[in-house]
């Protein structure tokens, strides 16, 4: 060409199956997660933010086979509620969503956040409270609950002698509470 010589090479791309790529991505992803506090489950050596008992992994209605620590992937999920453990074999994402919904688990984190915010707005409006919302705490709570419920509780007024900043910090950091304020 008038811009000079060009060189090129024709190569055949290595074929990789989507399921193999997914397994690689999943293992890299869960292996790279780090937690401020980790724990073990039973006598296993795997450290994790919460005890891991199961890895549910399916693609195109088939199990994605891999191991992580002492666990092997499967098409079964475990739900524990009210001291009852439920096991269910799942073959599709739709079936997974239905099973979780039947067990009052909200899969969509945006939906969990909307539920929390809506309840807060209702409480604030009905009691004429104002909020001092902590977005970081909201994000944390949204990600540690399966189905959020918002409760309004009072505490002993003697604690109001403690500086407000200490009360708020304690409620948020140690108990994951969201403080609301009246107009006094």
Task: Label the model's feature ranges.
Residues 1-168, 176:
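Long, basic N-terminal domains or extensions that often function
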Residues 172, 178-184:
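Function-dense linear segments that define catalytic or interfacial modules
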């Amino acid at each position: 060409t008038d811009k000079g010589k060009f060189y090129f090479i024709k190569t055949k791309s290595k074929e990789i199956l989507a399921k193999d790529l997914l397994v690689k991505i999943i293992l890299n992803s869960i292996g790279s997660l780090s937690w401020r506090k980790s724990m073990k489950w039973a006598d296993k050596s795997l450290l994790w933010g919460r005890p891991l008992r199961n890895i549910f992994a399916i693609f195109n209605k088939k199990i994605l086979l891999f191991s992580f620590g002492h666990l092997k992937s499967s098409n079964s999920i475990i739900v524990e509620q009210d001291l009852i453990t439920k096991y269910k074999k799942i073959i599709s994402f739709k079936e997974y969503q239905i099973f979780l919904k039947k067990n009052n688990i909200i899969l969509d984190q945006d939906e969990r956040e909307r539920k929390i915010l809506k309840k807060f707005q209702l409480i604030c409006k009905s009691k004429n409270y104002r909020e001092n919302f902590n977005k970081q705490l909201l994000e944390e709570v949204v990600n540690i609950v399966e189905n959020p419920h918002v409760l309004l509780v009072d505490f002993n007024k003697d604690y109001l002698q403690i500086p407000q900043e200490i009360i708020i910090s304690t409620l948020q950091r140690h108990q994951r509470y969201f403080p609301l304020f009246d107009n006094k």
